[in-house]
Amino acid sequence: MKKNVTELYKTIDYIFADQGLLEQAMTHRSHKGQHNERLEFLGDSILSFVIANALYAKFPKAREGDLSRMRSTLVRGQTLAEFGLEFGLGDYLRLGPGELKSGGFRRESTLADAVEAIIGAVFLDSDIERCGELILSWYEERLNAISPGLNQKDPKTLLQEHLQARKLSLPGYTVVDTKGQAHNQTFTVECIVDGMDSIISVGSSRRKAEQKAAEKALKILKNEP
C-alpha cells in the first residue's frame, strides 16, 4: 500500500493481526493479485445483519417497512463511501494503472466496496462480536440521528436533488482546515454552490461539517431563516 497503515489502524479503530487481510481488502479487482470482491461479499452480509439487529433493538415498535428503509439508508453505497472518505481509504487503495489514471481512488463505488471489504476482513481477523462492536462504533452518530417515519435523506442529498431539479451544477466540498489529533479533530469545510457566496462550516468530522454546510446552503436557496 502507498502509505503506512498505522494511521489507518487509528482511523478505523482496529489493528489487524493478519495485515494480509487488510491488504486484500484494499486491493481493487483491476490490480494484480488477490482482490477484495470476496471480502466485499462477506462484509456486505455482516453489515446488513449488524445494522438490522441494532435497528430492531433500538426501535421495538417500528414497522418492518420503516426498519427496512432505515437500514437501506445506513448501508447504501453513498453512506459507505462517506465512511471511505472519512477513513481516507483512497490513500491506501491498490488499483490497476487504468483505474488509477481514471481517478478510481475517489470513486464512490470503489470506496464503498472497500469499506465492506474491510468489514469482511475484520470478521475473518477476529470474530462476529468484535466486528459488530466495530461497526456500531462507526455508526454511532448515524444510528443516534436516524428515526422511523422521517425522510431518510440527509442535507447533502437534499441539496444535490434541489440543484439537479433546476439543472444547476452540483455543489463542491473542500476541507480547508483540520485541527487536533485523530478521534479528536475539528474539520472546517467550504461548500461551493454556483451563484452563491462560499459557505464555511465546522464539525467534529468531515461528514458533519459537510452536512452543516449543505443545510445552510439549502436554507439560503429556499429563502428560509
UniProtKB/Swiss-Prot annotation:
Q: Keyword Protein biosynthesis: yes or no?
A: no
Entry annotated with the keyword Hydrolase: yes
Q: What is this protein called?
A: Ribonuclease 3
- Complex formation: Homodimer.
Q: Where is the RNase III domain?
A: 5-127
Q: Where in the cell is it found?
A: Cytoplasm
Any GO BP annotation: mRNA processing
Please name the NCBIfam families in this protein's record.
Answer: RNaseIII
Q: What gene codes for this chain? A: rnc
